[in-house]
Amino acid sequence: MKRSLHQVFMAITLISASFFSQAAETQTSTWQHIKQTGELRIGVAQGEPWYFKNPSTGEWDGIGYNIGKELAKDLGVKLVTVETTWGNAIAALQTGQIDTMLVLDPTEERKKAVDFPEQPFFWYAQGVLIRDGIAVTNWDDLNREDVKIGVTLGSSPDLILTKRLPKAQLVRFPNMDEGVAAFYAGRVDALSYFHPALALQQAKVGKGNLILPKPIIEVSTSGAIRKETDQTFHNFLNDEFAKLYKSGKTQHYYEQALKLRGVDVSKVPSVIKEDWK
């Protein structure tokens, strides 16, 4: 009997210890966790030029990865990459698997689940990869019945151009690869997506001109973090984004990622919106 009571007591003690340990971990802020472990954990997901993994070495590269290295250096900790997907990044943050997911747009829906610094990480614009021979300065120049524009079905560019260009023929593809193939084959006159992705596709097909029609449709991206009372990491990320943006390092790592794919960066709009004239 005494032995049974002792076993019950020990079981309760272990359960209580586990409960309070988990509670303590839950209460530990991102900043505290980084300092205690000496690690900054960033989510990484395939998607150039933000992140890409070298199949030969297994090493990650891209603007998101390299800015992650800068953050870890300024924190005085080790950078740890945690592979995830764009769709699972929010859940990975909420469950404490990662400390931040860089290059995640601060949409209103995402803001309900996670936090974002006020300072944008960088900017991109809705661009157009247009075939040679078509002069375009403004979006209105594309609002013609004789112009076929390829877009990815259901994407932001699709939704925006459906309203902005009612006269143009929008040709919708299930993914960008099919749109690029159609552009290369001459089945569409232009492709519209955000300009960093178009820069990579232009380098692949070796055709067309990449432009940002006016008025420029701009979108900021950021770094998602957990919602928490302790705002230390939030404020750190806010200050770092501002510093790296103004110093030119953000643009440097963007260009570096494009150069790895043979892109002539002198012909590509930057991710610094003040450069867009």
Regions found by a protein language model. Give the residues of each.
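Short helix-initiation/N-cap motifs at beta->coil->alpha
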Residues: 80-91, 136-137, 171-185, 219
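Extracytoplasmic small-molecule ligand-binding "clamshell" domains
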Residues: 24-104, 112
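Ligand-binding clefts/hinges and TM-proximal coupling segments of bilobed small-molecule sensing domains
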Residues: 24-28, 156-171, 241-277
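Extended ligand-binding regions for polar small-molecule ligands
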Residues: 62-74, 134, 140, 155, ...
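A ligand-binding cleft/hinge motif common to bilobed small-molecule-binding domains
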Residues: 88-91, 104-113, 160-163, 184, ...
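Periplasmic-binding protein-like
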Residues: 122-130, 195, 199-241, 260-277
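Flexible hinge/capping segments at coil-to-helix
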Residues: 130-148
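A structural signal for short loop-to-beta-strand junctions that line the ligand-binding cleft
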Residues: 31, 62-64, 111-122, 210-214, ...
